[in-house]
Amino acid sequence: MKCFGPFLAVSLLAPAAAGSHPHIFVDTAVKVVVSEAGELQAVEITWAYDEFYSLLIFEDRALDSDYDGTLTAEELAQLQGFDMSWVEGYEGDTYLTLDGEALALGAPEHLSTEVADGRITTRHRRALVQPQAADGVVIKAYDPTYYTAYTVNRGLEVTGGCQGSITPPNLDQAYTMVEELLYAMPAEQAEESYPKVGEAFADTLRLSCGA
């Protein structure tokens, strides 16, 4: 789940039932910055929020008073970086691993915030704390609690002569796992603590370099 101010207010409006996850839908693009030497240096993430969540953000910040789905230049300036105020411990819903070991990412750098057709789209960059050989790196975009659903449907770009592939999740297996976990919980616990199943619903991005 995203951990920034407006999200906390919006979450109060969301249905409480555990089975109703996810609540927020984000179309995602990933640009992987790799040097000519094959060293992974950074990732640039694009989040395009669904129309309903965008509307809630507008209302929370008293923007788009004429409800036409577009913002004035002044309103857009107020929105810049709205999703970059992350609480301590929040991973940014972006996870990189190599041979099963996590690769640490630095703090987010806001790149842009735009609004089109009533949807907010933001871009940010995160550098690796320690640059890493890109070959074999796996990237996943997911909220562990599955409150937010990310789909990498806006493209994967890899620079530096490496390539990337996208493998979609096995949704049948993912939903079966959710059902089994929920049925194993007391009803009151399921309502309060949704199982951390987000990774099961994530696209898998894999980098390869060389011939």
Each model region followed by its residue ranges:
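Sec-dependent signal peptide recognition
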Residues: 1-10
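Short, functionally important structural connectors and interaction interfaces within domains
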Residues: 4-5, 32, 44, 63
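N-terminal signal peptide c-region/cleavage motif recognized by signal peptidases
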Residues: 14-17
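Early extracytoplasmic/domain-onset interaction patches
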Residues: 22-49, 53
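Short, surface-exposed loop/turn motifs at beta-strand boundaries within globular domains
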Residues: 23-25, 38-40, 89, 117, ...
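Structured domain cores in non-transmembrane regions
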Residues: 52-132
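Mature, soluble, non-transmembrane domains
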Residues: 97-211
